[in-house]
Amino acid sequence: MATDWLGSIVSINCGDSLGVYQGRVSAVDQVSQTISLTRPFHNGVKCLVPEVTFRAGDITELKILEIPGPGDNQHFGDLHQTELGPSGAGCQVGINQNGTGKFVKKPASSSSAPQNIPKRTDVKSQDVAVSPQQQQCSKSYVDRHMESLSQSKSFRRRHNSWSSSSRHPNQATPKKSGLKNGQMKNKDDECFGDDIEEIPDTDFDFEGNLALFDKAAVFEEIDTYERRSGTRSRGIPNERPTRYRHDENILESEPIVYRRIIVPHNVSKEFCTDSGLVVPSISYELHKKLLSVAEKHGLTLERRLEMTGVCASQMALTLLGGPNRLNPKNVHQRPTVALLCGPHVKGAQGISCGRHLANHDVQVILFLPNFVKMLESITNELSLFSKTQGQQVSSLKDLPTSPVDLVINCLDCPENVFLRDQPWYKAAVAWANQNRAPVLSIDPPVHEVEQGIDAKWSLALGLPLPLGEHAGRIYLCDIGIPQQVFQEVGINYHSPFGCKFVIPLHSA
């Protein structure tokens, strides 16, 4: 009879659209084919209404979770004389908007359209009675849900205790009240109150598990594998590898010798390079002898002029700005260089430098006074210079009145001291001092009397002369003199240039 199922705790599956309901059977109507549940739960959440009625046509599956004992269903009152199938399985359940419907048996494949379900309210959880028959089977869904809910709440209380303890003691905690706050609480429980089957009460023992790891055995296995595969061993204590990598070389190097150049006479002045190597100065007579011996061995004047012109032009290009100034974007701002040359070999060196500068798109203005007879070296250099875009002038009036980017001085020569008394020499010195452009002197002589053009930079050839402060900052260029040529004139020589052809020198 239908009254036999009153008070039973059942689980009704209404499909994916309506979900699963649990509750205690309060009424079974065979005429209208409906079943009512009191204190219902929808998908594990307490429902708003105290009672929900289902139609048989919307029931997909019906499970009996608990059958009440005798006398447990007397408080439900008189019920309709109806009958319910043995299990109710194979039927579907639907809910009307008013919570009522008809009980109609249908196959599991048929279902009705889902209906709206009333909203949930904040209803206090109630205890569910469990009969002695439940001891032989698993706990009901309601009991398991209540236990998991209490566990999840206690879990959150433990793990969120820092939030309450970190507040200021005098700071009041805001409280929420009302139905809306209760709904938010139920939503939090629905989101974060999942079933937690097991919460570990003890922390993980890291030290104990680390003690179980045999590191020595693992490292021995790795070393054995590397020896067999031929890879480099990691190294064992008290064992020294037979070979070292390039970055593991611990062999002590020889002490650094900074004085690698020794001259045969007393040194009046010494210089040093950026790396600390000592470069002594030599006298003009020894320098002249060095060039003469080099020329005898094949380093002719033409080669020396070419090498000097290349080194001087490289230094001048660097002083003009290098790639920042000489690039296709600055074609409209070509640097201007004024060359002041005398009628001697020093002047020929300047003309060679001007030719290389003109080949690098530098605007070169060459000043050379007119003489009836010129040296062959000067004639050859002028012939090459005339094939460039450089400009040659013989009068100081043709020199630019505005400042140029650089002035290269090649007027002085120790063998032609009388030229300093010439009007063109004095006029050229006056023009250079008034132009206010930086001056680079190529192979300047040692002046006994301070006069002429004060240079900002000076370029020495091979080995420097004992130049004074008027020479500015000293640079040294390599003109290709072999080491044995130095030894032939009594100089113990080791190149200080390294990877460069022009290096700066500093006063020691």
From Swiss-Prot:
Residues 192-228 form the DFDF domain. SMART domains: FDF, LSM14. It is found in: Cytoplasm, P-body. One of its GO terms (cellular component) is cytoplasmic ribonucleoprotein granule. One of its GO terms (biological process) is P-body assembly. Expressed in theca and granulosa cells in ovary, and in spermatids of the meiotic division part II and apical membrane of Sertoli cells in testis (at protein level). Also expressed in brain and mammary gland. Changing F206A: Abolishes interaction with DDX6. Residues 191-296 are annotated as: Required for interaction with DDX6. It is linked to Intellectual developmental disorder, autosomal recessive 50: A disorder characterized by significantly below average general intellectual functioning associated with impairments in adaptive behavior and manifested during the developmental period. MRT50 patients show mild intellectual disability and microcephaly. Binds single-stranded RNA. Involved in the process of mRNA degradation and in the positive regulation of mRNA decapping. May play a role in spermiogenesis and oogenesis. Belongs to the EDC3 family. This is Enhancer of mRNA-decapping protein 3. The gene is EDC3.
